């Protein structure tokens, strides 16, 4: 049995091509990438969040220029491959793309340094088509600190959370440290998401979410995307099979996150285990979940329905 659809909350394909120096106009159909229009299964309605990853070392005007260049690249690719992919800003756009047999493409940002410490840039970012922003990467920026430090949100970071909610940009807390996430809990008034994070009780990495954090996100109606990266799935990183990601699924379910769990692959942002290293293996993953006793309703929830419901309610 194959899934009807799949919504993937995170990949780094856009930025990966910029670093590699390849022809950025052709990136979305570059077979050298983990994710390409060719590798996406034609019989699965696919929605992909394409993240503009802004490196931690870029701040201020340099971060703005990098972000603007990446957005221009995204727009070029949407035009070049308009027969196969469609840019989307909401669920209605996504469903129109699916009805036309196209991949639905959402634009996101990984690292709030793209705001360059200026609240007025948040509204502009929304107008550029960005649907979600990861507040930090691993290091520090104007909003706060990532998982390599213990500092929480700055005053600007708290103000940015409120302005993102006002503008209708989804807040992404993946990469944020525990103090920063606690500050988001105090500041945010709307549900938010962790686009690519797993359960720390299963794999003890700082990038993963604690049980207390997961339960609070469930209470708030948030969304959590399973990350396929080995060191976030299994202590030591040596993923042996799909059993390693299933342990996270089972743990999230035990914590009441059955309606809050989604997918956030991290394609082209990390070296992934062989069982999860291609969009073409999505059907194998889906069938595996069913073989482990996950109901079709819950498997559909993980693959697309939980994310679709969340986006319909929260993506302005």
Where are these regions (language model features)?
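Mid-to-C-terminal alpha-helical segments outside catalytic/metal-binding sites
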Residues: 277-316
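Beta-strand segments within the central parallel beta-sheet cores of soluble alpha/beta enzyme folds
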Residues: 193, 262, 300-304
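Short active-site-adjacent structural elements
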Residues: 16, 270-274, 311
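Extended, charged catalytic domains and RNA/DNA-binding interfaces, predominantly
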Residues: 2-227, 231-236, 246, 250-251, ...
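Short acidic/histidine-rich active-site segments
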Residues: 228, 256-279
């Amino acid at each position: 049995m194959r899934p009807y659809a799949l919504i993937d909350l995170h990949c780094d394909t856009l930025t990966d091509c910029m670093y590699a120096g390849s022809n950025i106009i052709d990136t979305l159909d570059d077979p050298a990438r983990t994710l390409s229009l060719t590798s996406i299964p034609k019989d699965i309605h696919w929605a992909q969040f394409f993240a503009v990853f802004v490196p931690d070392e870029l701040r201020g005007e340099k971060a703005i220029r990098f972000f603007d260049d990446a957005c221009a690249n995204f727009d070029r690719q949407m035009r070049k491959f308009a027969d196969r992919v469609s840019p989307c800003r909401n669920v209605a756009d996504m469903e129109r793309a699916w009805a036309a047999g196209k991949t639905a493409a959402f634009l996101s940002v990984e690292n709030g340094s793209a705001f360059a410490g200026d609240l007025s840039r948040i509204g502009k970012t929304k107008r550029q088509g960005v649907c979600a922003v990861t507040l930090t990467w691993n290091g520090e920026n104007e909003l706060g600190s990532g998982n390599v430090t213990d500092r929480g949100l700055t005053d600007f970071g708290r103000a940015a959370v409120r302005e993102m909610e006002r503008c209708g940009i989804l807040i992404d807390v993946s990469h944020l440290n525990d103090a920063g996430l606690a500050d988001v809990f105090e500041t945010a008034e709307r549900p938010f998401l962790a686009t690519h994070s797993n359960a720390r009780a299963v794999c003890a990495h700082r990038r993963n979410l604690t049980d207390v954090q997961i339960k609070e996100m469930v209470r708030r109606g948030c969304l959590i995307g399973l990350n396929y990266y080995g060191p976030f799935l299994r202590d030591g990183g040596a993923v042996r099979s799909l059993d390693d990601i299933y342990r996270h699924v089972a743990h999230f379910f035990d914590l009441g996150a059955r309606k809050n769990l989604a997918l956030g692959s991290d394609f082209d942002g990390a070296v992934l285990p062989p069982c999860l290293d291609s969009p073409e293996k999505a059907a194998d993953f889906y069938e595996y979940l069913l073989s482990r006793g996950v109901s079709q309703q819950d498997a559909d929830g993980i693959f697309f329905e939980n994310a679709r419901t969340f986006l319909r309610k929260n993506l302005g």
